[in-house]
Amino acid sequence: YVNHLFATAKNIAELNMGATTVAAGFLHDSIEDTSVTPEQIEKEFGEEVLFLVEGVTKLGKIRYQGTARYNESLRKLFVAMSQDIRVLIIKLCDRLHNMQTLDAVPREKQLRIAKETLEIYAPIAYRLGIKKLQRDLEDLAFSYVHPKEYAEIKKILKNKKEVIENHLNDFQKNLKKNLLKNGITKFKIDYRVKSLYSLYKKIQKYKGDVESIYDISAIRVTVPEIGDCYRVLGIVHGEWRPLPERIKDYIASPKLNGYRSIHTTIFTGDGAIIEVQIRTEEMHKEAEHGIYA
């Protein structure tokens, strides 16, 4: 029980939420599962922590009962969100630890909890723009709901890993050299590989044609200011040929969940096609941890 509370609080802290939310995360089950009273919480931790703990308690247990009850589950979550977004973030972090320890429960319960996670909790994390949480919830649930497909996607990524990393490392060096040559000195370059569930959905969309998916991996360039993003885009397009239909400016037109970045896909010249994502440090923080962090 205490391990679960620590883990939930840790998950919240990793999203860069404040001390009040972390404290409420540690206490989120206390009213329901212990003899601790609301008055004791308020006396020791203050009115705000109590408000959050009671919010999580009122939200209660959202149980997966098939698609017919899906909208009702979402309604409860959005009511909680309208009262204080932190209540929902605590609930999502609570669910993340439940998923991380799901191997300890019977198969039937595993399947129910994993379906809840995939169909209710992960989409909420997406709507809040908390990419890290969405990714973790989806991949954990995917392994229980579709174990065969999960194993297949892992195998695809494993087989492509070495080739992908070689292309990324070569391109990274060339990109760094070109940015410095053009006067961009403050930047960070890293890369991400598509999450397992995200790749699974993409493969379904392309009817199994993995070779038509150009964003299995992507280079990320992080710069200080918005103007720098467009300067980097100009340098990239000046050096490498872009695929015109794959240039997306989510800075000028953010996604509905608030996501901002520039995406472009280029031919590297050595037979590879690579997606490049360009954003500011603030945008990257928001993309990973949500705009509420």
Predicted regions and their residues:
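Nucleic-acid processing machinery
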Residues: 1-14, 23, 61-65, 70-77, ...
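Active-site alpha-helix of zinc metalloproteases
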Residues: 20, 24, 28
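Conserved catalytic core of nucleotide polymerization and phosphodiester-bond processing enzymes
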Residues: 17
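Hydrophobic or amphipathic alpha-helical targeting/insertion segments
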Residues: 28-55, 130
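Aromatic/histidine-rich interaction motifs
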Residues: 58
